[in-house]
A protein has these predicted regions:
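Low-complexity intrinsically disordered segments
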Residues: 101-105
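Short, conserved catalytic or adaptor-binding loops enriched in Gly and charged residues
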Residues: 107-116
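GIY-YIG nuclease catalytic motif and its immediate N-terminal context
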Residues: 1-99, 118-144, 148-150
Length: 150
């Protein structure tokens, strides 16, 4: 059941169930993923992954959950919003002031935890099909995407 996905997007592909991004068991295949805030929050991001040296969607999600994607795609979108949250920044500052600063990847992981993202995905034949599906989703949905304009 996908109460937050429009019928138009549902008709484009076979979407998985929603699961928390952190700890998600994602396939090693190309495809498109949707991210939303919380268990039933609004969809905020659509992304895609090609083959990624045989890692596909799983490789993309692992990059985000490792904290190593602070400057690309969903990782950057989450980090930008966490940095705009004064309470989140104060927590990081308190860590620094107490002599326990985190590395950049730690900040990335903390931002991802703060965002409480849940994801679902659709498998595609290859990276090009994923790119096309991602564009279709972006054109159908009129939401306040976290995606940067392309």
């Amino acid at each position: 059941m996908h109460p937050v996905i429009s019928q138009g997007v549902l008709a484009l592909a076979a979407w998985s169930e929603w699961v928390p991004l952190i700890g998600a068991e994602v396939p090693r295949l190309p495809g498109v993923y949707l991210a939303r805030r919380g268990q039933s929050g609004p969809i905020v991001y659509v992304g895609m992954s090609g083959e990624r040296q045989g890692e596909g969607l799983r490789g993309r999600m692992r990059r985000y959950t490792s904290g190593k994607a602070l400057a690309s795609g969903l990782g950057e979108a989450v980090f930008d919003r966490a940095l705009a949250d004064l309470d989140w920044v104060r927590e990081r500052l308190a860590e620094v002031e107490s002599g326990q600063p985190m590395r950049a990847t730690g900040w990335g992981k903390a931002a991802l935890t703060w965002a409480d993202l849940h994801v679902c995905w659709a498998i595609t034949a290859d990276g090009e099909a994923a790119r096309v599906l991602e564009e279709q989703v972006l054109s159908l949905e009129s939401v306040d995407w976290w995606n940067r304009a392309r």
